[in-house]
Amino acid sequence: MTARMEQRFADVAAEGRPVLVTYFMGGDPDFDTSLAIMKALRQAGADIIELGVPFSDPMADGPAIQLAGQRALKAGQSLAKTLELARLFRAEDQRTPIVLMGYYNPIYIYGVERFLADALEAGVDGLIVVDLPPEMDDELCIPALEKGISFIRLATPTTDDRRLPKVLENTSGFVYYVSMTGITGSALPDPSLIAGAVARIKAHTPLPVCVGFGVKTADHARAIGASADGVVVGTAIVNQIASSLTEEGRATEATVPGVEALVRGLAAGVRAARLAAAE
């Protein structure tokens, strides 16, 4: 875990609440608006920012995030430009962890060694690469860890106790528990099932467990955050961005303020939650 990531989790845990992890697609709807959104996320109360890297074949993404990726690619967004977004944000904010989330193909084409060097220089703290299983850790996970960049794994309800230790073996930063199977943006899971799932994962790792997929409102965030170390919100933010755009997919005066207002509400929900361990 990077020092910045570790410090953020420690600071938030001292407040007796979960972290709020916010995701949006880098370059959606354009580069400059994305940078403004990153800044607005932090101002609104995001503790960690997941920055999506657009890819032409996003197999794990729901329709909203697929459309966001298409808008970003159409606007000329690339892995290099996503790293530039991180670098520009980091120049003004030295404390908020940045996690890049995407697929291996753009990184492979970019070059793993070059990518890790540039990510480190840009101030990236962690990676989520959804199509690299633990059996391929030598491709990117191990080199990233050697550079001091966290490699965050996804666990799901179908990740059984035999598979879980393998998934967690080289995981760093936090564990991202996908609270349902399927694609991003599905319906909210039953909060009563979250506590048991988090406890099961924590039996295998000391890492924080953040729960995502389906969180849309402050009430959702509060309910999920009651038993998790973090709440991940993505599709709701992506939908908010999309709803503010012109018919041509361009940003409007409402784009950034709309995201900021949504995330302020989510942050209030998270701040109202209490970790089970503190109750």
Curated annotation (Swiss-Prot):
InterPro entries, per the entry = Aldolase_TIM, RibuloseP-bd_barrel, Trp_synthase_alpha_AS, Trp_synthase_suA
Alphabetical UniProt keywords: Amino-acid biosynthesis, Aromatic amino acid biosynthesis, Lyase, Tryptophan biosynthesis
Describe which pathway this protein belongs to, using the record's wording: Amino-acid biosynthesis; L-tryptophan biosynthesis; L-tryptophan from chorismate: step 5/5
* GO cellular component terms given for this protein: cytosol
| Enzyme Commission number(s) of this protein | 4.2.1.20
Please provide, alphabetically and separated by semicolons, the GO molecular function terms listed in this UniProt record: tryptophan synthase activity
Entry-linked SUPFAM superfamilies:
Ribulose-phoshate binding barrel
PROSITE patterns reported in the protein's UniProt record = TRP_SYNTHASE_ALPHA (PS00167)
What does the UniProt record say this protein does? The alpha subunit is responsible for the aldol cleavage of indoleglycerol phosphate to indole and glyceraldehyde 3-phosphate.
Q: What is this protein called?
A: Tryptophan synthase alpha chain
Originating gene: trpA
